[in-house]
Amino acid sequence: MKRAFVTVGTTSFDELVARVVANDCVQILESLGYNHLVLQVGRGTVVPKPFRTESFTLDVYRYKDSLKEDLQQADLVISHAGAGSCLESLEKGKPLVVVVNEKLMNNHQFELAKQLHKEGHLFYCTCRVLSCPAPVSLLLVLLGSAKILQQLPSATLSCFGYLPTQAPVLVATAYSYLHSVFSSFPPLSTFLIIPCTMQKGWKKYCGQKSLNEASMDEYLGSLGLFRKVVAKDASCLFRAISEQLFHSQIHHLQIRRACVSYMKENQQAFESYVEGSFEKYLERLGDPKESAGQLELKALSLIYNRDFIIYRYPGKPPTQVTDNGFEDKIILCYSNNGHYDSVYSKEFQSTAGICQAILYELLYKDVFVVDEETLKTAVDLFRSGSRRNKHHALTASVEGSSDQKSSTEDRTEEAAACSSAASTPEGNKQGTERQKVPESPSKMLFPYKVLKALDPEIYRNVEFDAWLDSRKELQKSECVEYGGRYYFLGDKCQVCMESGGKYYNAHIQEIDNDKSSVVVFIEEFAERHSIPLAHVRPVNQVALLPSWNAIPIRNGRGYPTITGGYFPEIVMTDMNMKQRKKMFKKFRGKEIYMTMAYSRGDPLVPSRIQHSMHYGHDPLLYYSQTAGHILSSQHFYPQHSSQRQGRGYGMPRDSSHLISKQNLPNPKVGFCSGSGRKCCQSYDNVSYRSRSFRRSHRQMHCMNKGCQYGFAPENGVEETVTFYALEEGNETAYSTLPNNGGPTTMVPATSGYCVARQGYNSCKPPLNSGDSNDHCDNGGYHGDYLYSSEQGYETSSVYTTTVSTANLSLQDSGPSSVPQDTVTSYNYPQKVLENSAAIAVSWASHVPVPVIPNCAGDNEALRTSDISSQNAIQPGFVPPPAQGSPAYLEPSAAGAAGAAAAAAAAAAPVATPVAAPLPLPPPLPPPPPATLEAGDASGFPLPPPPPPPPPPPPPYSYDPSGSDLPQDTKVLQYYFNLGLQCYHHNYWHPMVYMPHVQQQLQPQPQPQPQPQPQPQPQPQPQPQQPQQQQPPPQQQQQQQEQVHGESYPDCTEQPLVDQSAPQVYSDVVREDGTQADVSTNDTFPIADAVPLPHGAVYYPVMTDPYGSPLLGFDSYVPVASDYSSIAMWHPVNAACGASAQIHGAMNPGPIGYMLLPNSPHYTPQN
């Protein structure tokens, strides 16, 4: 009775136990003569039930005090890879098969089993079924090997242990018995030729094939077939047919041409299977790079009188593609990727291996005149020294037998085999897998592939090897070197058609054989061209080019320094978003956008050409030199590139990588390439992550002159705006570009200015007397910024609105004054403010406002502190000089925002003059009343604008169906919410809602002198001349017709409210000075009628009484709107005046429509 003992020690190895007690395994044990099986299951959960039959007995237990008795009685030991079990079995001299538990990690079982196997003491494997060409369980391999070892002589078995000199004898003896033992098992015959390399040899082989291919090889091997791999290209079908017809694959092109010709001659039989043009299909089929399919198989079957049988799926019978009744068959294997391989029988493989060996022997003996003994010795050395590779080739896989190493590796391996034969005793040669490479390769005889072909037991796939070699050469040719640079297929590059010509973006598609030129696809032309390598250059991602005006940079704070910053337009245009993001560098904890100019001194662009350059998003930004020493020039380009206008690259479209104080993205400002676009972008509430950049910067938002929603083309010139971020101390070291003359005024900063100009000019006038070469394109506007500077213009009244975190400096020329901490100065000219509208003033708390001189000493500025964002905002009415109350601010001659305030009002700003005012200019004619809609309500004399023809009025919405409304829903949402917000502000003064009572029916009273001294940086008109500022009725009528396109009759309604006196929310002042109680129904009583001063009504946009939207919600409710004023339209016609009632108003009568004739165009945030 033969006994097999299976042990797992103290571990748990349920998979091994389950495999051993399986029915198929028990039957194999019985067929091999084993009739008693003992299982030691250890801690496992799988515990089979013992049973006893007449032919087989199964005993099961978990632990014993000692395994010596079972090991002594066992004829075969199957054990886990534990060191104790292996040593005990080897000490007993028992045949041992070790099964490695792959679920155990880092226990060195595999290394131990591999080393003992390498020394010839045991066999090892795993429980999983390998992807091998034979569908057998690994347990069959184990049991078969055990029977082989049982048949070995006892003297040989006694060699088990640690005798390395006798171990190879055991391996050789076991190998000699494998064929005889498994001759009755055809599926195992090829798989178990060399069981010692079962793990190591198959690992590489299995890694080269896909799961489908391995399963197909296993299935074909069970049928006595093998798959010969064909070159994996579009001609695989024709190669396989050529080989089966002519025993060679070199005729695949002739077979392809024959197929095309036959299908062309018999078009009626194949045309119905083709979609589209049949001629085009045949034309494509004639290309060797086009694959073939079932239609071509049908034609080839008729051409060569053979039917095709194709194996498609493992485990399923083949498919007979053609059934033409031919006796000869062509068997193919089809993969899911459309690849065809040849299928042969194993007998053909054996015969082909012998024929191949004879052919190569004749070749080397008769052609290369190699001694026969030399060939024989080389083959013997190959068989003994490269047994792993020999087994690799005998496993019926042509892929595995096709060596893919370079010739150097082949020669090295062959040299190792020769060295092994020369230095190793005869008894050790057969068990040596690989020896060290000798120092001298002079003993190398033949390449490894040649030795495989000389071995009659190996069938080498020569065709596949040749195709692989050609692919290697092709891969080597996919790279070309020129001028120290390497160019690969698919690389992007820039090429020029002729020497010194323009470079175009392209990518390499082919490399010529001579390696002197490449075939590229030029994107701009959408054409292929052969370009010499001398005209090819690589594409640089982002290049820092030297700036035009280098500024000395001193080291400080240890930050890195970049000494260049001008990025041409073509470089920025070609960069994608990912490359642009790379420009947003991080330096020691702060994020700096590379296109900003960080400098203490003058701009990088010379002042002599600054007026002739066309800027992008924002102007040059100058920060203190200690803020990182990053020197970079703003993107600029000439004015003639009108098609690129408005697409500057100073800042990205998405300013989300600028983090606000609330960690929210900065509001986006869209940009348009139209010639009428006016853009001005800075940074609103942006705090840089740096000690040097902890200042907040305000933003002057985008204004679109070409918008059709309440805008009119304007007249004037523009220049850049200079932003400053200041360090503490050193208040006079930072200066802007010098301008020419004019006073300097500082007003409280706003979150956005709505400054408009009237008139239209077909071409921009020169920016100054020295720059007269400016021109315009198509009569449009070139400047991208709202504010410009020019000598000889005065400021109008400018007031603050909403909230601010910085101060604004209205500078005309010369070096600017440098404010203190948390002050940001804005440099823009006064001409833009010509005919501009006064802006409503915030009624927040103010501190005394000093005036400090600038660096040059010839300008004066008015300093204000930050305006609190927590206080309520009241409407402000800006009349001409009239008798008023301290509750309102009176505009000064200089247009300062904190010009007048009551001494009793704690929130009123107080101005302290520091320098004497300039002399007053002579009186000038008043501006036309149409400027009221453009934003000018000051009434002070200003220089008359040139007399250009009035522009056509912007279109209004007249269609009741709303078809002429803007299509952008976000724009509609914004203005709807704006009107709704005004509706809910029912606690405002009724003058806000009734523009028709603003008509001046009586003379205006004189303004009261203010107790506080007023700064006088600008000329102030005489108080006794208020009537000169009002145009005659005929001129007013004409201006209304020009702006609105239609005239309205004068309003004869009596005024209802005293507009000259301030109205407090809680009180109503009558004409007699008494107060009227406020009604409890949320309305105000109507005051006595008094003469009304002439002027526009301006009110601030209040904060949303219903709360701000949630974070992340893209709402268009104008919460604390950045639009500084909303000019009122004065239609007095009954048909045009609205009859809507304002709930909660003092006099809910008819009101006029409101529109924004010159307010900034709302840009939706994407």
UniProtKB/Swiss-Prot annotation:
Family: Belongs to the glycosyltransferase 28 family.
Keyword Zinc attributed: no
InterPro entries: Alg13-like (IPR039042), Glyco_trans_28_C (IPR007235), OTU_ALG13 (IPR047387), OTU_dom (IPR003323), Papain-like_cys_pep_sf (IPR038765), Tudor (IPR002999)
Transmembrane segments: none
Residues of the OTU domain: 225-346
Active site residues of this protein: D233, C236, H339
Disruption phenotype: Knockout mice lacking Alg13 display occasional spontaneous seizures and hyperactivation of the TORC1 signaling pathway.
Residue ranges, compositional bias (Pro residues): 921-930, 941-957, 1004-1034
Cysteines joined through disulfide linkages: none
GO biological process: dolichol-linked oligosaccharide biosynthetic process; negative regulation of TORC1 signaling; protein N-linked glycosylation; proteolysis; regulation of synaptic plasticity
Pfam families: Glyco_tran_28_C (PF04101), OTU (PF02338)
Organism, scientific name: Mus musculus (Mouse)
Gene: Alg13
Entry keyword annotation includes Protease: yes
Upper classification of the organism: Eukaryota, Metazoa, Chordata, Craniata, Vertebrata
Tudor domain segment(s): 486-546
Record-given protein name: UDP-N-acetylglucosamine transferase subunit ALG13
Positions of the UniProt region annotated as Disordered: 393-438, 921-966, 998-1056
Region (Glycosyltransferase activity): 1-125
